[in-house]
C-alpha cells in the first residue's frame, strides 16, 4: 500500500497496537466507573452485570453480591437489571479527604463457579464546600513606622474540595493603604499577605477595617470572608525576622518522644524589650499540631511530644511566629514542614469472607472453602504481603488477585479418618524486619445423609382406657439415626389415613420433636376397640430419609353404660309389665321375663337380677332368675295370697362401680273362671279393681295353636336333619351355622360356630351349649381393620329365642380368644352333681361356690390347635378377669329350664352372606326354638 507524503502505515498500526496493549494490561481484571459526590439515591453508575459478561438470569442463582471493605452501603446492584446505583450519600471529603484521587473499590463475587471481579468507582468532586477562614475576624497590629512594601502574612482560607473547586482567588476591600499579595502556583507554601503601599499615620488613621474575600474556582462560585481589624501602633518599628520563611524536616514515623525536630532562628533589629523575641506556634495552628509538637518559647526549639503515624498523615505544616517584647509587640513568621517517613510498623491484616463450611466429605477437589484478603497499611515494600498455609493438609491457597487468595480443596476428604481440620493462614510482609499475622480456619467435614432413622421394634401395642381425658399422653416413640448433625435430627409425624368417616388426625396427635403420642378426644370402647396407625420418623437431611412404626392402641372398656331395659310386651302401660296368673299354677311357673342389655363388655356387661324387698316382714310367692331375669313362682298359689303384687326387679351389672336399672312387673292373681271376666271388664273400661286386666283368652288360644303347630313342624324337621347328618363322630355331630350370641361383650356376629355335644358313657346327653368365638382384637399380624359397632339393634332368631324362652343345653362348646390372646379354659361340669338352679352363672372364683359346682379352671388347656373351620377349644370374655361358668340343673328339677345368661351387646345389622347350607338349617332351628319359647310364656 502506498501512502502520500511518504507516510508509513505499518508504523502507525504498530504504535496503535502498543497503546491498546498497554491500556489492556493496566486495566485487566477491573472495571472503572465514575460518579459525582452527593449523588442522590438511585443514581445510575453503570451496567455492571453487562460489563462483566454476566447474564441477568444467573445473578440470583449464582449469589451475585458486591462487597466493599470500608463502606459497603454506598453502592448497590439491582439484581433485576444488573445496574450499579448509588445507595446512600457519598461525601468525597469524608471518604478521601484532600487526596487527589478518590475511588471506591468493590469486590463482585459470584458462585457456581466462584469468581471475583474488581471494580473501581471514581468519586468526582463537586463544588459543595465554600472557602473557610480559620476565624471570622483577624486582628493585626502594625506599627506606624513600618516602611512601604512591608508584608503582613495572613492565614488563607481552606476549601475541602479538590482541583479547580479548591483553587482560591482572594480580593481585598478597596483601601489606600494595603494591597493583597497572593503567592503564585509555585509558591504554595508561601502564606497570603497584606503589603503596605502607603505609610501609616496613627494620628490620621488609628484603625482600618478591611474585608478579605476568598472565591473558589467551582461553578457556581462559592466564597468565604474574614474581617481584618488593623490597629496602627506607634514606635516599635522592627519586627523579628526568621532566617528562612520555610524549613523542611524529615522524621521517621517511629521517632521517639522528645526528639528535636528543628531550631528555627529569628532576629530583631530593635534593642531592649523591642528586640527580645518569644517563639510560639501561630494562633491558628491546629490542635493536632499542638498534640504532636512543642516549641520552646525562649530558644524556639521544636520537639516531638506525640505519636507520629505515616498512615494517618504524611506531612505536618507548622506555622511559627516570633514576637518581640516591644509595645506594641511585633512578630515575624515562618513555616516548618515536617515530612513523615514510613517504617514497617504495621503487621498485615487478614480477612476471611464467604466461608463455605462445613464441607461435605464427598466434595470434589478444587472446591472453594473461603476467600482470604490481606491488607497492610504500610507503604512500598513494607506493604507487600505473601500468604502461606499449614503444611500436610488437603487444602491449598490460590492467588486470585493482588492481596486476594482462595482456600480450595486439594484432594479428597475422608470424614471417618479426620472429621475436622484446624488450618493456619500466615501473611508476611516484605519489610525488614518482616511482620506477620495469622488467621485460623476450622474446617469441619460434614457427613452425608446415608442412614435412615430406625425404631427399636417394628410395632408397639398400647392399652388405653376409654373415656380418657382429651390430650392424654399414651406413648412415646423414639427412633435413632446413625448420622451426625442435622442428618440425625429426627422429627415425627402421623401417617394420615381414614378411620371410618373421620381422619386419623382427629383422634391421634404426635409431637414432632419428642415423639409423644397424644389422644385428642375421649375414646369409646363401644365404638372403637382397636386403633391401628403408623408414625413416621424422618431426619432433616437432604434428601430426607425416614421409616415407619406401627402402633396398635387397644381401647379398654370401663363401666360407663347402665343396663337398659328392653321395651315391655304389648299390654304394659306406664313402663310396667302387667301379667295375669291363675291361682292354680304350681311352683316354678314362669310369670314373666325381664329383658335388659348393657353396651359395655366383660364383667361390665354381665347382668344379674334380683327382687327388691317389699314391705317389712311380707313374703311373696315369686322369685327371679339371678342371671335370666325370669320371674317364676316359688310355690303353689293359694287363697291366702294377695290378688295383686307389685314386683320391683333390680338389674345391675358387675362393673366397678356397679350400675343398675329397675323394672316394674304388676302381677294379678285370678281364678281360672274369672280371668276372662276380669279381662272383659278391663277391656270395656268398667270401674273396679279388675278394670286393668286384659282379656287374653282369644289370643292365648290362637297362640297355643300356632305354637303347637310350629313346634310339631320344628321337631319333625329337627329329627330329619339329625338323622340325615353324618355319624362319623358317634353321638356327637358338628353343625356350622352363622349365629348371633348375646354375651358379656354384647351381641356378637360370627362366621363360624360349632355345636358340640357333651357325651357321657352312662346315658344320652342332657344339655346343649351354644358356643361362639367372640370378635376379639386380632394380634399384630392381623391386617383386618377393627370392626365398628352397629347402632342398629335387631335380634336374630337365636337371640329372640334366648330372650323369650328357655334354652335346653344339649350340647357343650368351648370358646377361645383371638390369636395371641390369654388362654382361659371353660369350666367343666360333673353330671352327677345336682344344682339348686338351672342355667345360672356362678360368681367369680373365690366367691364361695361349692366344690361340686362348675368352677373356673386356669391352665394351658389342650395344646391342640384348631384347624380351619373347627371350633376353638378356649373362651375368654374381653375385659373380664375371669371366665363365667354355667351350672347345669338336675334333671328332676321342677323349676323351668329356660334360665339363660343375658348379656348386653348390640347385634350388627348387616351379616355376611351365608356360606353353607348348615347355616340356613341352624336359622330354621332357631326359629323353632323361638316359637317354643313363646309358647312357654
From Swiss-Prot:
Coiled-coil stretches: none
Any Pfam family hit: Cadherin_tail
UniProt xrefs under CDD domains: Cadherin_repeat (cd11304)
Key words of the record: Calcium, Cell adhesion, Cell membrane, Disulfide bond, Glycoprotein, Membrane, Metal-binding, Repeat, Signal, Transmembrane, Transmembrane helix
Mode of membrane association: Single-pass type I membrane protein
Composition bias, Polar residues: 775-787
GO biological processes: cell adhesion; cell-cell recognition; homophilic cell adhesion via plasma membrane adhesion molecules; nervous system development
Residue ranges constituting the Cadherin domain according to the UniProt record: 30-133, 134-242, 243-350, 351-455, 456-565, 581-678
Signal peptide coordinates: 1-29
Residues covered by region (Disordered): 756-795, 817-843, 888-937
SMART domains with a match to the protein in the record: CA
Cell compartment(s), UniProt: Cell membrane
Region annotation 5 X 4 AA repeats of P-X-X-P: where it falls in the sequence: 774-881
Entry comment, domain topic: Cadherin 1 to cadherin 4 domains mediate homophilic trans-interaction, the interaction with an identical protocadherin expressed by a neighboring cell. This is a head-to-tail interaction, the cadherin 1 domain interacting with the cadherin 4 domain and the cadherin 2 domain interacting the cadherin 3 domain of the other protocadherin. The cadherin 6 domain mediates promiscuous interactions with protocadherins on the same cell membrane. Each cadherin domain binds three calcium ions.
Function: Calcium-dependent cell-adhesion protein involved in cells self-recognition and non-self discrimination. Thereby, it is involved in the establishment and maintenance of specific neuronal connections in the brain.
Protein's UniProt name: Protocadherin alpha-7
